């Protein structure tokens, strides 16, 4: 059904296919053990993009694992934990739909296990030790990583690497080789949240006039 619905867009074959490592810690919730913190790094966008001027306009850092950008989200989870093999824009939507069904069934099972008499808040010491704490959880758009240090009940350091941040450096290569009119389809497929905050600008190669400058719509 999902493939039939997307077929109406008449997307070119191979749109959005990108060959990068996957980032997925769990099929549904989150698993810190699956996050390779020792090989995690961030670089400034000026150092990542071929044109430093483009990097200066970016609003996020570029997170990397083993020095490479990654793919995170429903398709990455479905491939890593469920054997899903298709790639590209259509595959992103199909994987998202299949994952929603899986999570619906999981939610029903979890609701049946709820103990309404159990404590609603975990017992922990909020004074902190000054050591780095890392939390990893899977959101609808991908892996969410939060890092913090707390000492004497005060936050000393906090950083969030959200799915959009992981997805940004991967969506660029996923659009290469296709007409600019399909750029919005790639953005929507990889990161529906980002599509509401993205401009598509088309510049004439000869006279550098701006042919298009529109917001991407969800």
Model-based region annotation:
Residues 1-141, 151, 164-218:
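Active-site bordering "gate/hinge" segments
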Residues 144-162:
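Short beta-strand elements
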